[in-house]
Structures are given as C-alpha cells and as structure tokens.
Amino acid sequence: MDANHDKVVESGSRGGRGPVRTICVFCGSRRGNRPSFSAAALDLGKQLVERELDLVYGGGSGGLMGLVSKTVHDGGRHVLGVIPSALLPEEVSGETLGEAKVVRDMHERKSEMAKHADAFIALPGGYGTIEELLEIIAWAQLGIHNKPVGLLNVDGYYNNLLSLFDKGVEEGFIDAAARNIFVLADNAGELLTKLTEAAAAAAAAVEGGDGDQVDGEATAAAAGLKRKRS
C-alpha cells in the first residue's frame, strides 16, 4: 500500500464516524446529450447548499463539473477543485471557482479528493468518472477508507454498469456483500439522505451499534464498508 493510500486511511476516521460535511463529486467534463444530466448536476449542487455541505471535485470548469461547482460556490459553500497540471489547458477555461489545488497526476488527484471528502457521489460521466468511481469502491472493499459511496443513476445511465456488477457476483468475481457497498438513487435528495444514513450505520458498526435506526440499504452499505478483503 502506497503513501497516498495511507493518507486516505488517516482521514477516513472522520468520514465513517462523524457527520458528513464534504462531498466528493465525480462527474463528466462534458454535459452529455440529455438535458436531464445537466438538471441533475444543478439539483445536486442546490441540495449540497441546502444541506450546508461543501464540495471537493475534479477542478474542471466545464460540463457537469462546472455546473455543480458553480452552483455550490454561488450558494456560499466551500469548493475545492483538484486538478492535475497536465489537464489545466483542457479542463479549465476562464475563472476557477473557490479553492484550486494543482497536483502532479491522476493518482494524486484521487487521493487528494478522497482525503478531503466524507462521502462520494458519482454523476454520469465518461471513462475518467467511471474509473474514479470504481477505484473508490475498490478502496472501500479493501478497507482503505470507510466513507459511503453513492451512485446518482440519472435516467438509468449506470444500469449497464450495475448489470456488470451483478454478472461479477454471478460468476464469482465479486463477493455478494461487496455488491451493496454503495447506495443508489435517481435523484440527489434521496441519494444524500441515503449517504447520511450509511455514514450513521458505519459509525454504529464501528462503535458496536446495530444500525436499527437506518434503512436496510444503508445498513448493507455499512456492512460492506466494514468488511475488508485480502
């Protein structure tokens, strides 16, 4: 395990055992073809502001990243954008919003975002978004962090990925408990509520509680977060 992973572990105690204060959002540097994707990004930003949550994200000024970050920043919440130096010309145009941190590479970007986050949300996006989502799920499965992960499945965007996960369980490559290591919703309000419940369930699991006050999906996610893989 490398030094960046160690940093995530060190900060992980805040994510699983305390209130969710900062959300890391993975999403596309493009807006996609459907208006519903942009609408979901704007709604997520508004929900973060209403719930007094801060944002850490990939630092881009365009696409869904730009919509979420501008909404959160304009709403008076703290925004931290983390971007590799090589991507500055491609993903940043015009004025950056909030605090910007330039890092060396993609690996440092993910570790830095994870270090500052208490929970994670993936909106629709391309290869980069999917890679970030899968790595943060893998880190949870391996016990590198104990922070809840949420998938905002706008218009069924991630349905095929979810089917692939089911296939992995069916063929014996993914443990059945790990299939429920994240929470899922098709709207931001419901997903943020589930993430908060998953964080509470994870805290109860760590402290020896039974998690009875949260719903079954959150408890399943907490159980997945608690279990470590070899």
Swiss-Prot record:
Q: Which Pfam families match?
A: Lysine_decarbox
What are the UniProt keywords, alphabetically?
Cytokinin biosynthesis, Hydrolase
This enzyme catalyses: N(6)-(dimethylallyl)adenosine 5'-phosphate + H2O = N(6)-dimethylallyladenine + D-ribose 5-phosphate; 9-ribosyl-trans-zeatin 5'-phosphate + H2O = trans-zeatin + D-ribose 5-phosphate
Q: What is its EC number?
A: 3.2.2.n1
InterPro entries listed in its UniProt record = LOG, LOG_fam
- Lineage, top-rank taxon, reads Eukaryota
Coiled coil residues, start to end: none
Gene Ontology cellular component annotations, sorted alphabetically: cytosol; nucleus
Q: Which GO terms describe its biological process?
A: cytokinin biosynthetic process
GO MF term list: cytokinin riboside 5'-monophosphate phosphoribohydrolase activity
Residues holding substrate: 91, 109-110, 126-132
Family, per entry: Belongs to the LOG family.
The function of this protein is: Cytokinin-activating enzyme working in the direct activation pathway. Phosphoribohydrolase that converts inactive cytokinin nucleotides to the biologically active free-base forms.
Protein's name in the database: Probable cytokinin riboside 5'-monophosphate phosphoribohydrolase LOG4
